[in-house]
Amino acid sequence: MDFEGVREQFPALLQKTFLDAACVSLAPRVATEAIQDFLDMTLHCPARSSTLHHISMDEMRSVARPEAARLIHADEDEIALVESTSHGLTIAAQSIPLTPGDRVLISDLEFLEVAVPWIQLAPRGIGIDVVPNQGGEVRVENIAERLSSKTRVVCMSAVQWSNGFRCDLEKLSSLCAEKGVWLVVDAVQQLGAIPLDVKKTPVDFLACGGHKWLNSPFGTGFLYIRREALRKLLPPLTGYMNVEPPQGGWGAHFQTPSIQPVMDYEFTKSARVYEIGGTANYAGGIGLAAALKMIHLLGQDRIAEHTYALTDHLIAGLQALGIEIVTPIARQHRSGIVTFSVGSAADNTRLMEQLLELKILVSVRYTSHVGGVRGSCHFFNNTADIDRLLEAVESSVPRKSNGPLAAKATRQNQNARGNS
């Protein structure tokens, strides 16, 4: 499958220039067809019994676990299927053994969901320290300077939502390991666009919803928990799906007269302990598995190179128009997000509305005064999409190629050549 061919999986591209995977992405046909097959099964119950029908639902959903594990080079027993990134981060906050006086470190560029689970721990005496960004970037040395003897957790996005800054996770991982600090990562703006290998970059928790760059907006994502970390956690919720299946399976178990609710159950030692059951979002897991299979078919390294080529093209085009690039230029700190600014927040919102009228989908996003018009370059996009955006921006914004923005663009371009 090539990148032009994969566009056929996304019929919305026939009507719209979709450059907003960082918000909510499009679902491919393979995912919606897999879900439709599941819905047809629920309509007709082809299994011999309702019990077998239920078991088959679990089996269909479970395919998402090995696909998610493959995405980040984890083991399947380190993966739990969760509702969203928010769900995964909340599990981390509720499971890490913290005591009054402990501190959590985040940056001021984060989406609020990175902060909210820790804010909720304030009644338990848990505090938050915030690392201020430096020109839209949060370098590991900035984080190191803010660590204290009370810091127990660093919670950080792999890619920042407002400007696409990509953290040096490998360096951050080494720092946290050296200091004995838990590392919790929000990877929702990276995975599906830029590869991440948890074997090479150890983290304790990694949460990723399916609705953005994984092209699975069906209410299911995944949570990775490093095996060594699992042994130290305090799972906040339990259900019978946390229990290892009895000999012969649950179907035979439920038909046994001697069973009682209070028995000597063996709880799973895998990340699945966070899937409480007994029913789940089957359609979401099935859609996620299908979307992940498509990503694996395309190849993550190929997707990354395609993404970088598109972002290079977009950045160069914006610079030629004298428009301020908010996103870091150097590849090692870049992702599929390109954020730019044509002036004030009102100016950027006005431009976004003009683009939406032309069926060019982008967003305006800010945090801590960092942001602007945010475009997303994904594997289903092509240079024609980027050119259409650039043409629309050029016709909507007075050209500033000879002004101060052009000079800034030139400096950014020179820095990019030195750092990419």
Predicted regions and their residues:
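Pyridoxal 5′-phosphate
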Residues: 1-411, 415-420
